[in-house]
Amino acid sequence: MASLKRSNDRKVTNYVHVTKGGNATVGIANSIGLPSGQGFSCPDATAFCAKVCYAGKLEKVRKAVSSVLLHNWELLRDADLTDTVTLLSEMMADFVKDCDKKKAPKLFRIHWDGDFFSPTYVAAWARVIRDFSDVQFWAYTRVQTAAVYLHAQKLSNLSLYFSADPDNVDVARFLEGKGINIAYVDTTFAEGKAQFPTAVRCPELNNRDFDLINAKGSACARCGLCINGRKSVLFSTTKK
């Protein structure tokens, strides 16, 4: 069976390699991606999301990135539960080996691009997250059924966020009432704060001096807000 391919992401990596020239680069690939859009892995993508999706834009300009995402999609799209669990488990086992070798914290982002596209796929991830209890996972999803299902599994090593924007804010409020954290994006932080007053601004977007990656780690690893699921979080498309 072919293997899934992990992705390098400077913003979320759990291990930074510093070159002799002093440049901080990704040392471990700690995320998986799938092609975005309703025609692929994002069944509940909104119009707002499609308009601002940075990952979708990256797919169009970087053929190598798109190739990896499509490779993963072809392996997973029609796989049954057993095969999906096997594919994800083998990928995570390789990730754990990399972390142990470099003595890195085991932090893994599910979907830097893409989403939970089917009930089978969601159920497989729930099983894998439980099996890899020494890994801290975090994920954002616009799929309401996926958010409800994963939240109900009470997975202590998963920080889960329902991804919201002006187009699905009513669903987000409903899920917030069920105890699910919200990751809300709007044009400005002020507009987001008006919708979710207790949510906090993403430090990487809110602070221009907050490096995407440096010798001390990636932005997400240094912050830890989403990784540890502390609170609902706000994002702004204008960084204002």
From Swiss-Prot:
Domain of life: Viruses
InterPro entries, alphabetized: Gp88
Protein name per the record: Gene 88 protein
Provenance organism: Mycobacterium phage D29
Gene: 88
